[in-house]
Amino acid sequence: MVTKTIKSLNLEINFEVEDVPYEEEILRNAYSVKHWLRYIDHKAKAPNNGVNMVYERALKELPGSYKIWHNYLRTRRKQVRGKIPTDPMYEEVNSAFERALVFMHKMPRIWMDYGAFMTSQCKITRTRHVFDRALRALPITQHGRIWPLYLQFVRRFEMPETALRVYRRYLKLFPEDTEEYVDYLQEADRLDEAAQQLAHIVDNEHFVSKHGKSNHQLWNELCDLISKNPHKVHSLNVDAIIRGGLRRYTDQLGHLWNSLADYYVRSGLFDRARDIYEEAIQTVTTVRDFTQVFDEYAQFEELSLNRRMEQVAANEAATEEDDIDVELRLSRFEYLMERRLLLLNSVLLRQNPHNVHEWHKRVTLYEDKPAEIISTYTEAVQTVQPKQAVGKLHTLWVEFAKFYEANGQVEDARVVFERGTEVEYVKVEDLAAVWCEWAEMELRQQQFEAALKLMQRATAMPKRKIAYYDDTETVQARLHRSLKVWSMYADLEESFGTFKTCKAVYERIIDLKICTPQIIINYGMFLEEHNYFEEAYRAYEKGISLFKWPNVYDIWNSYLTKFLERYGGTKLERARDLFEQCLDQCPPEHAKYFYLLYAKLEEEHGLARHAMSVYDRATSAVKEDEMFDMYNIFIKKAAEIYGLPRTREIYEKAIESLPEQNMRHMCVKFAELETKLGEVDRARAIYAHCSQVCDPRITADFWQTWKEFEVRHGNEDTMREMLRIKRSVQATYNTQVNMMAAQFLSTNNGAAADAGAGAGPDAMRLLEEKARQAAAESKQKPIEKAASNIMFVRGETQGGAKDKKDTVVNPDEIDIGDSDEDDEEEDDDEENEMTNENQASAAVTKTDEEGLVMKKLRFEQKAIPAKVFGSLKPSNQGDSDGE
């Protein structure tokens, strides 16, 4: 290796042979940054002095190159990495930064690296000067790159005064970061300054929190800060701030009141804190806020009491004053707990002072305290406004008067009632209730005349005509049409007045047209008690003219009952006229009772023919669900009077008019009647008629009844006919179900259903054609006849197997479910019952196969399944007859 030395400008430079090409390039291009950087990269692994020398030479030629300065400073910082801050090399690097800033003072990256490097040396003052110089040298648009490092520096070391001043300068440029300043102040225990900053941002309506906190959350932080640190926050008026929050944030009153009280507690001003708690529970308007304040208040009193008791117990020289102080604190705590319900009631009344129920509850809480009760009632009736009252206002006046009455102050009670009748209630019923309660109080005091006079005052007619429902008039002017007042007036007249005055009251009620059916009934009973029967009947008739159905039902009931009790059958024509008048417009739901009463009258005092006529009319006049019962009564009465045969017409009419459900039962009863009379054929015809509305799947009881009837009174022919009808009805209902399903599908499927419907007739014609072909083929084949003609029992011959073999099977045969098996079982029962007839024939056995053969043969002849229409004639007999 050869070392060459170049002397120039008193600078001796030693370089190796490998450096010669780079040196030559530099000589040729001394002002080329690219060639210097290439040389620096070549010397990257050389000793520090060699690299630094190349950098120094480059910067001497190109002092304005930011790239060379940045790389040089980064290289020098790497060289001191791992060394202690007192190493001389640190000063060399600092000197390099200072020389760089002579040319690069507008480059923020250089200042940032210098500031971070100085911070790592823990030289506080010099670092602060560096950051200050950077802020002065750089334009304000680039200060945002310096401040984070500056703030990180002042927070890293414990220098609160410096940090406060730095933050204040920073917030002038970035006021939105005040929350970070507040956090630092709390960490540095500078709570007074923190409270001031928080108060400032809370008052600033344009402040937007970077952490997403609302103004309300910031306010809560301020309250917590100033209330929990009363000895460290001196610059703010805590009481004024929190009270301002009470006016501003009405949904957090409980928390704010507790914060204010807590401030005075921590300040040692316990009496002032107690005053705050008392003020709070007397002003909050929600149960939630009251609960928060009351719990804190109770806890404060309890802790105060316990601490004082501990102090007295620990002090051996405790005096009587100490014991008195303990007793005072204990009394305060007990008094607070006793007042809890009253205080809560006060909160609810502050929410709505027109809540009548809460006023009543407050009176209950003042039990055994007459003065407080009177004061509460007085305040209540003065506070509650009639149009805003929640509840019944008149109950306050009534209970107030009853309280005086219970304590023997009747005159005061009368004064209260008098005042209560002058209140402008919303409804007339409220005023009427006050008058009625007043009259009842007079009755309890045995002042009957006074009670009657009160009712006379209440019902006095006004000078001009006033409508009851005219809200523009006062309730006092409309009271004369109150039914409640008139009803009580009538009761009082009945009890303490004369017949004439009581009758006048009832007549006046009727004239005003405010009576009810009950008033009419009471009036009639009153007249009857005094033996004015015709007057009573006229009263009933007046009521009937005033009311319509169904309200007039009770009047007619009383009228007719009383009339029949008195006259019975002596005035039959008049009674008939009354019943006809009653039933003329009587609705079906009320007709049954009156028709039965009418019929009973005719039975007992009139003609049987008239009674039957009434029953006949009743069957069509009552409700549909009562028609069945009415027909049963009609039939029973007809049987008693005329005998069973006369009931046939009634049964026939019932079957025609009753709905299906009841018609079935009526048909069965009719058939049983005919059976009793020995008319078996008529009974069978009734069963056949009823069977058309009896689906075998639903009304199995009916078919079982018919079967039992045939077993007792029929023969094989009738049994087979019954089974045929059963299959026919079953097929009919199946067809109806299929039709409904088809209609449903056509509705849902639209065009597809239309296409399917068009294909239906073609398919049916195809089936009919196949059936005709099968019938023609079957006629060409010989069919052996049975040796003997058995009437209605299918027998088996030697040719039976051949018949079954030659029978043409129809693949489109209709299956009627299990009717075939049922048919075979029923046929077996018929054979057992008719053994006398079967003994005349040869040995006969019935099998499913033969039944199938007969079914197929009948199908071949009729072109449809034989079981659908049924037949009692064997197939071979039909063929022979045809031949």
From Swiss-Prot:
Biased composition (Acidic residues): 812-834
Cellular component, GO annotation: catalytic step 2 spliceosome; nucleus; post-mRNA release spliceosomal complex; precatalytic spliceosome; Prp19 complex; U2-type catalytic step 2 spliceosome
Domain of life where this protein originates: Eukaryota
Gene3D superfamilies assigned: Tetratricopeptide repeat domain (1.25.40.10)
Entry keywords, A to Z: mRNA processing, mRNA splicing, Nucleus, Repeat, Spliceosome
HAT repeat spans: 13-45, 46-78, 88-120, 122-156, 158-190, 268-303, 368-406, 463-495, 531-565, 570-604, 642-676, 678-712
Subcellular location: Nucleus
Positions with biased composition (Polar residues): 835-844, 873-883
Record InterPro entries: HAT, HAT_Syf1-like_N, HAT_Syf1_central, HAT_Syf1_CNRKL1_C, Syf1-like, TPR-like_helical_dom_sf
Predominant place of localization: nucleus
Ranges for region Disordered: 794-851, 864-883
GO annotation, biological process: cardioblast cell fate determination; generation of catalytic spliceosome for first transesterification step; Malpighian tubule morphogenesis; morphogenesis of an epithelium; mRNA splicing, via spliceosome; regulation of alternative mRNA splicing, via spliceosome; RNA splicing
SUPFAM superfamilies cross-referenced by the UniProt entry: TPR-like
Misc. comment: Named 'fandango' after the Iberian folk dance to highlight the similarity of the blastoderm cellularization phenotype to the charleston/kuk phenotype. The phenotype 'faint sausage (fas)', consisting of a poorly differentiated cuticle and head, was previously associated with the immunoglobulin domain protein CG17716 but is now known to be caused by mutations in the protein 'fandango'.
Family designation: Belongs to the crooked-neck family.
Known partners and oligomeric status: Component of the NTC(Nineteen)/Prp19 complex composed of at least fand, Prp19,CG9667/ISY1 and Cdc5/CDC5L. Within the complex, interacts with Prp19 and ISY1/CG9667.
Functional summary from the UniProt entry: Subunit of the NTC(Nineteen)/Prp19 complex, which is part of the spliceosome. The complex participates in spliceosome assembly, its remodeling and is required for efficient spliceosome activation. Essential for efficient pre-mRNA splicing. In embryos, efficient pre-mRNA splicing of zygotic transcripts is essential during dynamic cellular processes that require rapid division and/or dramatic changes in gene expression such as blastoderm cellularization, tracheal branching morphogenesis, Malpighian morphogenesis and epidermal development.
Designated name of the protein: Pre-mRNA-splicing factor syf1 homolog
Species name: Drosophila melanogaster (Fruit fly)
Taxonomic classification: Eukaryota, Metazoa, Ecdysozoa, Arthropoda, Hexapoda
